[in-house]
Amino acid sequence: MLNFKIFILLLILFFNGKIFAYGTYSEGWANAKILQFESRGLVFESYEGIIELSTFSTDEKCDEEKDECYTITKQKIPFSVRPENGETVNLLMKSLNQDLVINYRIHRIESITLSSVTEVIQALNPLTSIPAELESDKLIVSKTGSKRNFSVSGKILRLEYQGVIIGTFEGLYLDEVRGRVHPFSVTDEKMANYAWITMKSSLKCNLGISVAFATGFRKSNYDLFEINYIAPAGGVYK
């Protein structure tokens, strides 16, 4: 009898995972262009589309010491939205070929109610001012690198929390002066949350980047230690 109950419990967990997305590999925010969006399915209806994200090629030969890395390239990614997420569906429907800020999840196992592992759970039109959610126009945390520390004028294009057992914050920033993008990590959770809020605005800001000799568990040796809307990052403050 006990074995039967365990079997039923496992069965419920299995199907619940399949229908409602069993686990999440990563979740974050990104600036995305909406290329396609439509309704699909009969039994399990969902909304499916294609977004375009900024990215780069790791094969590019460039000099990081001279801030020449990397040239911006574009990547097309299929995504899904659940039909009960009406507000997001409606905004995406009227935003074809436009840039939005999206909140997304990448699932480890594709749900039978969705046609892709990338699920958009929220979409926003970019603000034209500093987000009211921010308590200050700058945030500074401890530097983690001793190789280089510098300021970049631009904005964050993508930032997500990745991993299942050991998670890290990984992102991509745009250097508007040089017209380059570069991957970076965030080792401070408060900074990651602050960065996510700044992404809701189209305003550029100053990003403080600390470069370490080693990456540790994170994917990039570039670490974000400051976001500043009023002055270059890395200044001296009392």
Language-model-derived ranges and their functions:
Residues M1-A21:
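Classical Sec-dependent N-terminal signal peptides that target proteins to the secretory pathway
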Residues I19-S26, A132-R148:
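Short boundary/loop segments of OB/S1/cold-shock single-stranded nucleic-acid-binding domains
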Residues S26-V43, K147-I166:
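Structural detector for short beta-strands of small beta-barrel domains
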Residues E27-W29, K76, D99-V101, N149-S151, ...:
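Intrinsic-disorder/low-complexity, polar/charged segments enriched in Ser/Thr/Lys/Arg/Asp/Glu/Gln
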Residues F44-F79, I166-V186:
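OB-fold (S1/OB) nucleic-acid-binding surfaces
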Residues I77-N90, H182-K200:
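N-terminal post-signal-peptidase region of extra-cytosolic proteins
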Residues M93-T113, I197-K219:
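Flexible glycine-rich surface loops and low-complexity tracts that mediate binding to linear polymers
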Residues H107-E135, A212-K238:
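OB-fold/S1-family single-stranded nucleic acid-binding modules
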